[in-house]
Structures are given as structure tokens and as C-alpha cells.
Amino acid sequence: MTQLVPLAELPSGKKIYSVRGQRFEVDRQYDLVKVVGFGACGTVCSAVVNGSGERVAIKRLSRVFGDLREGKRILREMEIMTSLKHNNLIRLHHFMRPQSKETFEDIYLVMDLYDTDLNRIIRSRQKLTDEHLQYFMIQAFRGLHYLHSAKVMHRDLKPSNLLVNADCALAICDFGLARDDQVMSSSDLTQYVVTRWYRPPEVLGMGSNQYTSAVDVWSLGLIFAELMVGRALLPGTDYIGQLVMIVNLLGSPSIDDMEFLSSEAKAFILSQPHRPALSFRDLFPMATEEATDLLSKLLVFHPARRLTAKQVMEHPYFSKYRDAAEEADAPDPFVWNHSHIETKEQLREDLWRVVEAHSQLNE
């Protein structure tokens, strides 16, 4: 495999690469191999550790002080990764220590490297057995239960955020949108929300204030369905279209089931023709009865009536893969200690403290 070639090596020992036209600066013991992921929030490269040959992923979070809200989001992601340790959550090795507190603009995370993700597996159209589905989904719900028991909700679960190795080991990644597990106001999700196809009714409710950890259960339910059929189950093109697709699938909700929606969302649904619920047994004829029974308890219109992640793991569908040690609660709730940040100077100080505390020098 052709590796990326460094452009220069600084006296400090840092290697400089050009990755997708941007400067990528890593410690001398790492050789970058290739880009494995990129987006608005950062770029991820695979790398090899000199000497040991260990393969890792290095994520560059760029221009962390460009926007205060975005910087606080990045800080939250970093704090969650340093605080929560579980086999089904991506493991952070350490942060690379910048040369100067006063001048650093980017943050580099060294993490476990995975071979692929569920999005690539689904798009490859490779044949998945029911055992594959059981094993993937029990791991996803183990990781999710651990997050929820730490009072954190992910809020952006989608197939590309579920990483997979050749041995089918799975880990949840990308905690950039994660928040404390509490009822959120609609304004909290205005800028950052679950990718549309995986949004539950309460996020599409146009004014609903009932955002809880149940949003993650809905998202994993849709991923489960996607694994069954090899395509997105609800590929809506906008908010209204997404809500219509949900109603077409689950049937027209009762007045009680719409109690969490805004008046506008309720009025829209009531203006539509009444729809009966579709049969999951007919929609997924290849699936077992236990699989469709579980799915029917995940894709529930009212968030309070969905199973919790803990209840999901107790479902008979997963009886073969139950493991009490992997299903334990987090020892402590996640605590966000940075509510005081109101300036970029305060953000710089707190980011530096976290990076220093978890840099390789302090491992």
C-alpha cells in the first residue's frame, strides 16, 4: 500500500503532511497511511507506529477556536472520550501535545483503528446472516447502554458511526453531538441534529421539547432495519417528507401519541389521510419473528414507549450473545465541568488542560 509522504520534519520532531489540501502535523513516531474519513468537523487518517507496527487512527479537529459553540462541542467530545471506557465505544489512546498553548489551533486524537463501518458494509451489499445482525446490534446496544447509564445521549447514531473490525467487533464513535442525558429544548438541537434519515418523530416535531435518550434507540432501530434490507428504510428528503414516511410506516398516531409534538406538527399529521400501520412481518419476510418483534419495540412513535437500551439487551433476540460483564452500567455519570466558558480565551485554557492531562507524555 502506498503511504502518504511527509512534506517536512520540524526540529520539534513533528512530521508535516498535506492531507486533502490541509496541513496535518503528527508526532515523529507516526507514519500516515491514508485518509479513512472526513467531514466538516475533522479528518481521520490511518497511521502506523514506527517500531511496533501498530495501526491507529489519527483524527484532526481543525480550527477549534473559530467558533465558540463549535469549540465547546469539541471539548465535550474530548471529555466524553477520556471519561467513558467500554469495549463498544471507540478507545482514545491519547491527544498529541501541541507545541504551544498560546498558538495551537488544531487538536489531534490518536484512537483505535477499525477496518470498516456499517455504512460501507451495507453499501457493499454483502450477505449478512441473522447471527451477524444479532452480534452487531447487541454490541451497539451494549455501548449505547453504557453511554446512557453515564447520563449521555449520542444524538447522531448512523451506520457510519458504528465502526467494525474483520472479527465483527463493533464500536460507537463520533461523540461530537453527544449531550448530557436530560430533556433538551428544541433550541439545543437547532444547529446539530441526528442525520435526517435517523431522526425520530420528536426531533422532527418542529418545537417539541421532549428530547431524551430515546432518540438513540430510534436511530439504532432504523440501522437494524437497514441491515435487514440493505438500504435506508426512511430516506426522507426534508423534515415534512421524513415525518410522512414515519407515519406511512407506523400508521397514523393517536392524539396521546402526539402529545410531545408542536401544535403545527400535530395539525399537519391530522390533515393527512388516516394510515394503517404496515406489518413488519410483511416488510421483512427474511427476518425472524424475534427480530421483527424487537424492531416493533424500537420504532415506536412515542419516545417514552420505546424500549430502553437495557431492555433491548434483555430481549430474546439476543439470548445467544448475552454477557453481563459487557452490559454493566458506567461507574459514574459523565460530568460537564466547563459551563463557565464564555470566551475563546477560557476555551483555550480548558482545552489545553484536557490535552495535557491525556497526552502521550502522561500515559
From Swiss-Prot:
Protein residues bound to ATP: 36-44, 59
Primary enzyme class: transferase
GO MF annotation terms: ATP binding; MAP kinase activity; metal ion binding; protein serine kinase activity; protein serine/threonine kinase activity
Modified residues (Phosphothreonine): 190
Posttranslational mods: Dually phosphorylated on Thr-190 and Tyr-192, which activates the enzyme.
Pfam families found in the cross-reference section: Pkinase
SMART domains: S_TKc (SM00220)
Keywords: ATP-binding, Kinase, Magnesium, Metal-binding, Nucleotide-binding, Phosphoprotein, Serine/threonine-protein kinase, Transferase
Active site, per annotation: 156 (proton acceptor)
Highest taxon above the source species: Eukaryota
Cited function: Essential for the two main proliferating life stages, the promastigotes and amastigotes, of the parasite.
Protein family per UniProt: Belongs to the protein kinase superfamily. CMGC Ser/Thr protein kinase family. MAP kinase subfamily.
Name assigned to this protein: Mitogen-activated protein kinase 4
Gene it is expressed from: MPK4
